[in-house]
UniProtKB/Swiss-Prot annotation:
Its main location: membrane. It is found in: Membrane. Residues 1-20 form the signal peptide. Glycans are attached at N63, N93, N135, N181, N220, N226, N254, N280. It comes from Dictyostelium discoideum. This is Cln5-like protein 1.
Length: 378
């Protein structure tokens, strides 16, 4: 019997080690940056500070860490160029996706980690719900801001990793996040196309002859190995005589480019300050945290997963123990009837332990205990 209790306690200790943040954790929010390396993009991004960014979270009370970022799927280039043109229609294969990982990548991918603010577990859980709503609202990747140089009016807003991060800062601040200090600053990339006119929405753009001709020419452009993004935009501007058709989440816009049509800036960007306003935070009516091994979208109910792992291991152990013990008692010890049950007297007193054990498992699997720390479902 003592061996059974020791084994159960061992399994409980394993279950406790795969937990999430607790209600008492103080959590630090990190601004993560990773350079877009020359080895991948060549000189296309030469002379620019091009970074991928994300948000990291770590507990000051434990070794728990999390990472959330927004990426172009399958890549940034696919958000600019269509997959193909077939039967008189432009076909795209592009989307934007919020990724969640239950650890911060420590392989050296992130070149910079800056502490921004502290939050608690309640804010973290609400943020995860907000992140899913963000991705349902903005499920595409749009590289460019489009700005009217005459009026300084933003005509099209980019939807990139930095936009997600700054929207995340805004959500966390309005939910009650506290800055590490009053002098926190952070910088980001901003890619801008300039026009001096209003942009024109193109009706039925995917089958529009002029739009198709534009993207056929785009697909046929051979980018030299030493081409920079500035040079590429200038080449496109000359090729298309200032008319640029921009694809944005199923829609097309005719953008008449300015004489200096492009800029790539890496500069300080303001963080949210002032009065907090929860009306800025849009959440889904219900949230379910669903972990995916390929980081498919959001979120990980680690307590629930741990609970079911515990159940499976415990039932497997019990089955093997009973079947093995019965076989040994029957064929080696030549017992019969109820005496076949291994440690029969000990098992008869196990009812209370089983009841308590299932109560514990239920609390871990459902997060139903009062004051528990199971994630709200997203």
């Amino acid at each position: 019997m003592n061996k059974i209790i020791i084994f159960i306690l061992f399994l409980i200790s394993i279950l406790q080690s795969v937990r999430g943040f607790t209600d008492t954790d103080e959590i630090v929010v990190l601004y993560l940056e990773a350079p877009l390396f020359f080895s991948k993009f060549g000189t296309l991004l030469a002379n620019v500070n091009a970074f991928h960014s994300g948000l990291g979270f770590y507990s000051l009370n434990s070794n728990e860490t999390y990472q959330v970022d927004f990426v172009a799927v399958p890549g940034v280039l696919e958000s600019i160029l269509p997959n193909k043109i077939e039967n008189g229609e432009i076909i795209w294969n592009t989307s934007g996706k919020v990724q969640f990982s239950d650890s911060i990548d420590n392989t050296g991918y992130w070149s910079s980690e800056k502490e921004i603010m502290t939050i608690n577990n309640e804010i973290f859980e609400t943020f995860l719900c907000w992140a899913q709503n963000y991705n349902e609202s903005l499920s595409y990747y749009q590289l460019f801001d489009v700005l009217n140089r005459n009026t300084n009016e933003l005509l099209v807003k980019s939807v990139v990793c930095n936009d997600f991060v700054w929207a995340g800062f805004n959500a966390l601040y309005n939910l009650g996040g506290k800055y590490i200090n009053d002098s926190i600053i952070a910088s980001r990339d901003i890619v801008t196309l300039y026009t001096r006119e209003s942009i024109e929405y193109v009706q039925d753009g995917s089958t529009n002859i002029e739009v198709i001709s534009f993207y056929e020419a785009m697909l046929n452009i051979s980018i030299p190995k030493n081409q920079t993004i500035n040079g590429l935009i200038e080449e496109l501007d000359e090729l298309f005589k200032g008319n640029f058709y921009l694809y944005v989440n199923g829609d097309y816009y005719n953008v008449t480019l300015d004489s200096s049509p492009f800029s790539f800036a890496y500069s300080e960007s303001p963080l949210p300050i002032g009065e907090r306003d929860l009306s800025n935070i849009t959440l889904l009516e219900s949230c379910h945290f669903q972990h995916s091994s390929d980081n498919d979208i959001i979120l990980n109910n680690k307590n629930g997963i741990g609970g079911w792992i515990f159940i499976i291991i415990l039932l497997s152990f019990t089955t093997v123990y009973l079947v093995g013990g019965i076989l040994i008692n029957k064929f080696k010890n030549e017992k019969s009837g109820l005496d076949l049950i291994p440690n029969k007297d000990s098992w008869s007193s196990l009812g209370g332990l089983i009841s308590d054990g299932f109560g514990f498992i239920k609390s871990k699997a459902t997060g139903s205990t009062s004051g528990g720390n199971g994630y709200s479902s997203i």
